[in-house]
Design a protein with these regions (language model features):
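A short, Lys/Arg-rich alpha-helix, primarily the initiator
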Residues: 1-20
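DNA major-groove recognition helix of helix-turn-helix/homeodomain DNA-binding modules
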Residues: 49-64
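Recognition helix of helix-turn-helix/homeodomain-like DNA-binding domains
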Residues: 30-45
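DNA major-groove recognition helix of helix-turn-helix
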Residues: 40, 58, 66-69
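The alpha-helix within a helix-turn-helix
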Residues: 15, 26, 55
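Residues within the helices of the helix-turn-helix
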Residues: 12, 23, 34, 52
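Short, charged recognition helix plus adjacent turn
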Residues: 19, 66-74
């Protein structure tokens, strides 16, 4: 089961792995550096729209982060 903590873990790990500065990532996705810092400190959770932009900026698959299974091809 997906939990908020698992989503946060995935986001935090991806941000750290990216090597991007918080300010640069924030500018890229349209949020402030302090908002990125709040994500890293688990104070707030990004909206789905922001999560989508984060995934794009960090080259992540949103389905994996949200633990959504993709339909299998028949």
């Amino acid at each position: 089961m997906v939990t908020i903590e698992k989503i946060q873990d995935a986001i935090i790990e991806a941000i750290k792995q990216s090597g991007m500065k918080q300010a640069d990532l924030g500018e890229k996705i349209g949020v402030s550096q302090s908002t990125i810092a709040h994500y890293l400190r688990r104070r707030i959770m990004p909206s789905l729209d922001t999560l989508s932009r984060l995934c794009t900026a960090l080259d992540l698959d949103a389905n994996e982060i949200l633990c959504v299974e993709r339909p299998k091809d028949f």
